[in-house]
């Protein structure tokens, strides 16, 4: 009679099993710590403020309400913010990826003269910034205030992303370029037609980072953009939360400052969901590239 093949876990020594179980328990707790707040925010955005305050989360749908979503989505400025945020994020991502990849390539070449000097210059900028006031004066003198370029250009280049891309380039065998040169490929042909297609994971990773960073950004827009028609989504949502004044009819229904505060709390949850939803939809499509890019960027220092 054939004996059943032991599982990999059963073959492990007792000490390894204990460590593995502890690791899974810690991982499970970590996952719960991430998932539970998200679930709470999603459910709380649909529950009327008073039942939520009195009895907490409930699955009694009679107590659920779309008031917060109706209020936020009925604001015409929210759609302008969505459009602006999408345009800014896409343009910023494209500019950032192009600049980063072009800067990382020569820095990955050991035969590039001045490589160490530029490395030092780049690293210095990671620790010392220009400061808010000097940057504002510079952007003002360049005539970029209240323009899209004020939020696209200053942060388009990231030294950290450049280092990750450089590390990825350095992990690609030099033989690949030598073979391309034998076939008559120029430096430009090698970079655009051979190297970049191999770098899809790191490109997707950098693009994801930059897109998320710009999508969630509001401070630069608050400083440099004065026109309401140019405000991104996060700034619009921030304004809604700060003002959080119900419509006149809603005030007469609730008739108290406490009710307005409860509505503001409900609006807070709804705005979190509205601002995060596009990223939640996008992330699964980039996850495989994101994981590969992170691992590839960590191979070398």
List the model feature ranges, each with a label.
Residues 2-301:
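A hydrophobic, multi-pass inner-membrane permease signature
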